[in-house]
Amino acid sequence: YFIALGDSLDIDVDDLLDFLARDSKTSAILLYLEHLSDARRFVSAARSASRNKPILVIKSGRSPAAQKLLHVNSGMDPAWDAAIQRAGLLRVQDTHELFSAVETLSHMRPLRGEKLMIVSNGAAPAALALDELWLRNGKLATLSEETRDALRQALPVGVEIANPLDLRDDASSEHYQRAVNVLLNSQDYDALLVIHSPSAAAPGTESALALIDALKHHPRGKYVTVLTNWCGEFSSQEARRLFSDAGLPTYRTPEGTITAFMHMVEYRRNQKQLRETPVLPDSLTANTSEAHALLQQAIDDGATTLDTHEVSPVLRAYGIHTLPTWIAADSAEAVHIAEQIGYPVALKLRSPDIPHKSEVQGVMLYLR
């Protein structure tokens, strides 16, 4: 389906999630969000739907200019990230990443861990993959001595046994097959990335066939998460077609492959958060009757929002400490209060007509 909700006057995103979660023809849900009318309902619907199928989110309005255009609150992006993670969703940054991520999550089995093993026929593409993995806070696997010994016996003298495993630029398809067969016997990693750079000594199509054959005939071949990156836009077209036909995910660049792997990692982390019960503090004390009385008084007075000094008593009723707040009618009174309590102080504009004071320079910090 392709569904546009317009201004969401009658049907909102949470209604849509409830429907798509139960729809047997829907395997994944892709969301574009600007704002929410009911955050609580959205999180509830998202948590329920994400237990059954992957949900990917693009949230616009990250820049001040976009926030102004969309009339959305500034400074809310960290809250969006926290809600998306807690609901078991995956947030992506652009449409290219959106479709790449849904392709990865829809066709690959979930990861059982986050450790990555890299095999390459050159240091350069492996280094690019490592840089991207480091930037995204990914984890490299550590090879056991048993696996290292098996690789030394299987590979030519001179190949450094490490992660990444650089088979060198003269690696043949047989070297790829030997290395992968040894690694398939190992439990040291959670995902295997195989990289190939085109060279005269190492034809890409033959190496691709060797990898497919190794996975096909090994008992663990269909249970291991394998990602492939055969570099070369035209020279590796046939290899990428073979991988697609074999059901193996394949990517054009080392960075793109790492991005796909980290999508799986982040999705795994968020799904883990989805299943966790929030930890409650041992010494939680709440005077709910006092809080209810304060809120009821505000409702009786016709208030629809609470000022900073009005929120503080409600928070204190739940044991949440806040900084003391004073109200000044003019600048002279503000100076007098500041001299009484001591500098530095923060000054905030008080106006019911301006919901976001910082947007009009209505918040000044560290005044002396």
Predicted regions, residues:
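Catalytic-core regions of core metabolic enzymes
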Residues: Y1-R368
